[in-house]
Amino acid sequence: MAVLDEVQSSDVLVITEFRPNKNADVICAHLEALGFSYQFRTVEEPKKNGVLVASKTPFEGSMDEALGDHSHRVAVAQFQGLKLFGCYFPQQKEKQKVFDYLIDACREGDSNVITGDINTGLHYADETGASFYCADALKALNDGDMPDAYRHLHGDKREFTWFSNAGNGFRIDHFMVSRLLLPRVEACHYDHAPRESKASDHSVMTLELEVSK
């Protein structure tokens, strides 16, 4: 719960690898006590991982049947003037299906945000080698309608958000925003303390977006 307490000043939270068991019920209740009264989850089965979106302001949550068996991996949260895609990507080549969906979905509208465990990055920039599956699909998304908010602010700076058992670091957690939203990106950064303390196996990522301009 300490991690949740540390991010309670946020307006919206996206929690991936969310599994609706007894622990999840405690998490959701704690979030509500912190003011995150509006919640949407993509899974109800206790043995399946999905996405939880929790917000202090109302939104309409949904899943898209266009994703088929992967529909639980993307929570679509429609806020007033902003559409958020909270993602928990599959492994290896299965990621391509989710990338294809997002590339198509983000052609519409100019106020889209993608975030979550994207489970891939760019070769040599977000890892020391070239082991990522579907790195070209991520690059196509970034070069197209959804630039990487972290790279927009920090350039070639290298940070890793997850480490393998072998100790290899990777940046696989991302925020991507519509090009017209780029001037409104005020901050995009990682907090590695939750990962380093083993409260989570991923670093926490934060985006500060001015939405009133």
Regions found by a protein language model. Name each.
Residues P46-G61, F79, K83, N165-R184, ...:
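Conserved beta strand-loop-helix elements of the APE1-like EEP
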Residues R19-N21, E45-P46, F59, F89-Q92, ...:
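Short, solvent-exposed loop/turn segments at secondary-structure junctions
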Residues A29, A33-G35, K97-R179:
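Metal-dependent phosphoesterases centered on the DNase I-like endonuclease/exonuclease/phosphatase
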Residues G35-R41, P58-L67, D145-H152, P183-R195:
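Short secondary-structure junctions
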Residues F18-Q91:
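Structured beta-strand-rich core segments of catalytic domains in phosphoester-bond hydrolases
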Residues E44-K47, L67-S71, A166-F170, S197-D201:
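A short catalytic or substrate-binding loop motif that flags glycine-/basic-rich loops and adjacent residues
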Residues L4-N23, L84, A105-D126, A149, ...:
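Active-site beta-strand/loop signature of hydrolases that rely on acidic residues for catalysis
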Residues D191, R195-K213:
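Surface polyanion/phosphate-binding segment centered on an Asp-His-Pro turn
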